[in-house]
A protein has these predicted regions:
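Conserved, single-site charged/polar hotspot
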Residues: 1-312
Length: 312
């Protein structure tokens, strides 16, 4: 069961009892609704994640906004990590790798706690890849072991907690904050371009996303560029990589269209400009997935064919 607080009033629910909220729920007239589990976790039956129906510990605050109902989960950092680490790294990985992931995730979380990522909701982060994936997997024994073994440990740089950006798969190189248009300085100098390799080659050379390619029809790409940039460039005649950054990341492209040209800067904006639905991404293991709103990476080259652009 749980305690439901609405304004100055509160009531308890029985174990297993379902409580529903919608835009017409009168309790919203009192402001936020707070849900406090008496024991265990609160399950969200209307939410679907990789594990199916997720459940959350800590307290839950439910608020009504013009755009819909917003759910904010307040949870202790170590309990949070027990659902982040298995969501970001398979629990079957080596324990030392999981411990590294736990330290990175903890460091990243503490840095985000310095300010609200969503000030309008008084929330530091969300549960997606925009920050760290949370709750897409239940706590796993090995992942929890890694979190417990590193409890409280963070990465430090010049007396401050480092911002530990990480990724699922590299192409054999990392890059610096220049990828996002941020100048390198004394505060972020630890984020450098390095080779991710050893004596037998790149560490990730056998992973599906180590190499990928997309053969995008010119018509499809032209339509996506117009949608993504809001500019009527017409049929795209060429894509030129005009600037690369540390590690080989693409920092600037020039789109040449029949009605004009456009320049796009920084990693995320470039991926967004060339992303969208309508084509397929082929991974090096032969697997094929539909395109999404972002190109998989900004480490790529472009080849122009008769009626396609080959990005890989």
């Amino acid at each position: 069961g749980m305690i439901v607080e609405t304004g100055e009033e509160s009531y308890e629910t029985a174990p297993g009892e379902t409580v529903g909220f919608n835009q017409d729920t009168e309790d919203f007239n009192e402001g936020r609704i707070k849900l406090i589990p008496k024991s265990g976790e609160i399950q969200f039956q209307s939410v679907n994640r990789g594990i199916g129906t997720p459940s959350y510990g800590g307290t839950i605050e439910v608020s009504l906004y013009d755009e819909g109902i917003v759910v904010v989960n307040e949870v202790g950092i170590e309990d949070y990590l027990k659902k982040v680490v298995p969501s970001e790294m398979p629990s079957g990985f080596n324990l030392e790798a999981l411990k590294c992931q736990a330290v990175c995730a903890r460091s990243y979380a503490y840095r985000q706690m310095a300010s609200y990522g969503y000030p309008e909701y008084e929330a530091h982060v969300d549960d997606s890849t925009a920050y760290q994936v949370y709750g897409n997997s239940q706590p796993q024994e090995r992942s929890t072991q890694a979190v417990n073994a590193t409890c409280g440990e963070v990465v430090m740089y010049h007396g401050q907690i480092a911002t530990t950006y990480y990724y699922s798969t590299s192409c054999g190189e990392t890059t610096s904050l220049e990828a996002w248009g941020t100048p390198v300085n004394d505060e972020n100098g630890y984020l450098q371009a390095v080779e991710v390799s050893g004596k037998v080659g790149d560490y990730e050379k056998d992973l599906p996303w180590y190499r990928w390619e997309a053969a995008i029809p010119v018509q499809t790409l032209s339509t996506l560029v117009e949608q993504n940039l809001g500019k009527g460039l017409g049929m795209i005649r060429d894509i030129q990589v005009t600037k690369k950054g540390p590690g080989g990341v693409v920092l600037q492209i020039k789109l040449i269209g029949e009605n004009g040209d456009a320049t796009v800067d920084t990693e995320n904006k470039i991926r967004a400009a060339l992303g969208g639905n309508g084509y397929e991404i082929k991974k090096q293991d032969g697997g094929v997935v539909p395109s999404s709103k972002l190109l998989p990476s900004a480490f790529f080259t472009v080849e122009k064919g008769a009626d396609i652009f080959l990005i890989k």
